[in-house]
């Protein structure tokens, strides 16, 4: 399973539910596209209290043409809740799939890279795409 998708514009998600952060990288965005953070937050507020921090690819409210990377810091995680079940795959979750795919090295806490939290970076990417398409 890849964590990257797309053609002309590539989207890559990264991070784990109980890691330091999750995020998204959008590659090949056109340079000079205006980005309104308030418009993005309208979509992000539909998620938890996820506040994206753009760390590259944006300058003075416009895309630079280089990869745009947004981080969402994980907070209020309770990783110790998973200590007792770390070797027991949960039904209806991707624990076993992650174990097999990554040779037992996947982070199972909170679902790891397969957590529903990884939809937050996709919401950010979708909000960015929506802004772009509205100008076309």
Give each language-model segment a name.
Residues 1-136:
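Generic N-terminal targeting/processing segments that precede catalytic cores or assembly contacts
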């Amino acid at each position: 399973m890849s964590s990257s998708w797309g053609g002309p514009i590539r989207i890559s998600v990264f991070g784990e539910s109980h890691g330091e952060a999750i995020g998204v990288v959008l590659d090949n965005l056109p340079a000079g596209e205006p980005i309104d953070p308030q418009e993005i937050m309208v979509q992000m507020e539909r998620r938890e209290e996820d506040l994206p921090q753009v760390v590259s690819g944006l300058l003075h409210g416009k895309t630079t043409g280089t990869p745009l990377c947004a981080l969402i810091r994980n907070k209020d995680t309770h990783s110790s809740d998973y200590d007792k079940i770390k070797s027991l795959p949960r039904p209806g979750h991707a624990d076993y799939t992650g174990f097999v795919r990554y040779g037992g090295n996947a982070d199972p806490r909170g679902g790891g890279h397969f957590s529903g939290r990884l939809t937050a970076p996709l919401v950010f990417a979708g909000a960015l795409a929506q802004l772009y398409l509205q100008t076309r």
